[in-house]
Regions:
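A glycine-rich phosphate-binding loop feature that marks nucleotide/adenosyl-phosphate handling sites
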Residues: 65-66, 119-120, 163-174, 340-354, ...
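Extended redox/cofactor-interaction regions of prokaryotic respiratory oxidoreductases
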Residues: 1-13, 37-39, 148-272, 282, ...
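Long, contiguous, secondary-structure-rich segments that constitute the structural scaffold
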Residues: 308-310, 316, 320-376, 382-385, ...
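Short beta-alpha connecting loops at secondary-structure transitions
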Residues: 24-31, 281, 285-291, 302-313
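Hydrophobic alpha-helical scaffolding
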Residues: 29-34, 73-78, 92, 99, ...
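Flexible, glycine/charged-enriched surface loops at secondary-structure junctions
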Residues: 53-62, 127, 158-165, 335-342
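Active-site phosphate/pyrophosphate-binding segments
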Residues: 77-209
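Long, well-ordered, tryptophan-enriched scaffold segments
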Residues: 4-7, 11, 16-123
Length: 596
């Protein structure tokens, strides 16, 4: 909102015009789900097409900082000579990726793509930002490369006012090294003796059918088919049954195994289908804690929150650590071998190893001052130390926040040093540069073996994507499932959390959002109860007819706790993953937003 006040213009590319876009008065380009890659190929073509006239492309940046854009800048490890520019121009397949070609697939008008290409030019300060939604799609393993490539074409990296990357909730405008970090609890590291994992797209089939692809844990070996016989599901967090695709299969898997055990604070979907539920205490029932953290940092870049117990643990609830110790004792293990010291000592260890960056932007210092009296009050072992904020003051405030002001030394521009001198400041790739052609990425994805990709981004029709909605693409004959479904986040929930809160359920009724055009064609009016049918499930929801969803798309909010009618198999709650198939492709990223 501050950027809007300062005059920034926002362009929003999404199948649904969300509340954030409305608040920013954003121009809307209503794209079809799972078509971001053809859209960006059309955008790249339009940037090349108009470059001579408009001066759009930053050729100096491309030539200096990237490999693989054109034939003159290929990486040393390339196994073929295909480059991005020639692919976009149609040299290899005879199909130029024109805005008209892109428009037929993505639904955005070709003229709008050309207009955006000019906006993306090097003369403008542009933040080209992508959420994770367009990556949660089948067959888009090269999408991050393509986002990077479009940003690089305009030179939108490494300098003030220019950004290319991801943006979502806690990582929106929050890049750079952490200014204050949580410390370490001091617990010894436990090595995992099992070098194995089951991909989320295969987990239910692995239980039901007894086979899966093995690729290793924390690395990717060439995949091999392996047999497995799972008898117990033990869950110690999350709500996997509700958040994984193929929920109907998941329920079947939960019912098949001999036993399901769940740690749970609330009676979630996963807990409801469990045989044993171990009640877990909430953070409000625990002695102390420090909360920081997002997908990038161990903490929010500028802040760590601190809390103390509000109430004693209710009923029979225990912490996960207490349950682990009690189960361990029943298995003949000593408590001190599982957790050598208690939660209070762990908290103290984290507290005294918290670090903050000094005003010079470089020097690391102790964040918290601890006295001998503090140590005595906590009942822990340790030494007093100096720090920037007294422990008692931290707990009184409930937050440690680094003060910011204009001109401080905490600013951060990603890749700034690399962009100024890529030879002296290489990035962590085989070439040391941004790899528009990435042999290592293609080799890894292809070794996993669900489907193959090329080292440069290329368009692969998406399984369960827009083209799949037609019985015949050339004649545009609709198929059995002509609508695409997306699962936007919704004000009632954070993922699946809070769906049991009655006030929120009353305020936000979890409808299915449908366009005016599609509603009129189906004879649906606002408030009608409708049946949604996909290849893998059915649910009923009230309809909200709106102009904020593009035609051909319905939006079923993410995270409702499933309520299956056992006689009909129809979900009464509108759980999005009850309608979504598990279809591993490429590196097997879950294709939540490629669904019909």
């Amino acid at each position: 909102l501050e950027a809007k006040k300062a005059g920034a213009k926002f362009i929003y590319i999404d199948p649904m015009y969300c509340e954030s876009a409305a608040a920013l008065d954003a121009e809307w380009l209503p794209i079809r789900p799972a078509t971001d890659m053809p859209f960006m190929f059309g955008l790249a073509y339009a940037m090349l097409e108009q470059d001579d006239k408009e001066g759009i492309i930053d050729w100096d940046f491309l030539n200096k900082c990237t490999v693989g854009f054109d034939a003159d800048h290929m990486p040393a490890d390339a196994k073929d000579n295909k480059n991005f520019k020639d692919y976009v121009m149609g040299t290899y397949d005879g199909t130029p990726k024109t805005p008209e070609w892109a428009s037929e697939i993505c639904g955005i008008d070709a003229d709008a793509i050309r207009k955006l290409a000019v906006t993306m030019g090097k003369k403008n300060k542009v933040a080209f930002l992508s959420s994770a939604a367009n990556a949660r799609v089948n067959n888009v393993d090269s999408l991050p490369q393509l986002v990077m490539t479009i940003g690089a074409m305009g030179g939108h990296m490494g300098k003030s006012g220019h950004m290319t990357g991801t943006t979502m909730h806690c990582t929106s405008g929050n890049g750079g090294y952490a200014l204050v970090t949580n410390g370490k609890d001091g617990l010894p590291k436990i090595e995992n003796p099992v070098d194995d994992a089951i991909n989320g797209n295969e987990v239910w089939d692995a239980i039901l059918n007894g086979h899966y692809k093995f690729t290793g844990t924390g690395h990717y070996d060439p995949a091999e088919q392996s047999a497995i016989d799972i008898h117990v599901i033990y869950r110690n967090g999350g709500n996997k049954l509700n958040t994984n695709g193929g929920m109907a299969k998941g329920i079947e898997a939960f019912l098949k195994v001999d036993m399901v055990v769940s740690h749970a604070q609330f009676y979630t979907t996963s807990a409801r289908y469990s045989d044993i539920v171990l009640p877990i205490s909430t953070e409000w029932e625990r002695a102390h804690g420090l909360i920081g953290g997002n997908l990038v940092h161990k903490s929010n870049r500028e802040m760590v929150q601190a809390y103390e117990r509000i109430i004693d643990p209710l009923f029979e609830s225990k912490s996960d650590q207490d349950i682990a110790c009690e189960l361990g004792e029943k298995l003949g293990l000593k408590k001190e071998d599982i957790y050598p010291f208690d939660a209070e000592q762990q908290f103290f260890n984290v507290l005294t190893s918290m670090k903050v960056i000094d005003a010079d932007g470089k020097t690391e210092k102790n964040a918290v001052k601890v006295t001998d009296d503090d140590i005595k009050a906590l009942g822990v072992e340790g030494s007093a130390q100096d720090g920037e904020l007294e422990y008692t003051e931290l707990m009184k405030r409930g937050v440690y926040q680094v003060e910011r002001h204009v001109g401080d030394n905490y600013g951060y521009i990603a890749l700034e040093d690399f962009c100024k001198d890529p030879e002296k400041n290489p990035v962590d790739t085989p070439s040391g540069k941004l790899e528009i052609y990435s042999q290592s990425w293609a080799d890894m994805v292809n070794a996993i073996g669900w489907s193959s990709i090329e080292p440069i981004p290329t368009y692969i029709p998406v399984v369960n994507g827009y083209e799949s909605s037609f019985a015949d693409w050339d004649s545009k004959t609709p198929g059995e499932y002509p609508l695409q479904v997306i699962n936007p986040h919704y004000l009632r929930r954070a993922h699946t959390a809070f769906d049991n809160v009655s006030w929120l359920r009353e305020a936000w009724t979890n409808p299915v959002f449908i366009s005016r055009e599609d509603a009129a064609a189906a004879g649906i009016v606002d408030g009608d109860t409708v049946l949604l049918t996909s290849p893998v499930g059915k649910c009923v929801r009230p309809a909200t007819v709106t102009a904020r969803v593009r035609p051909g798309v319905v939006a079923l909010p993410h995270g409702a706790w499933v309520q299956v009618d056992e006689e009909t198999g129809i979900d009464q709650a509108g759980a999005d993953n009850y309608l979504i198939a598990q279809t591993p492709t490429g590196a097997a990223v879950s294709g939540y937003n490629s669904a019909l």
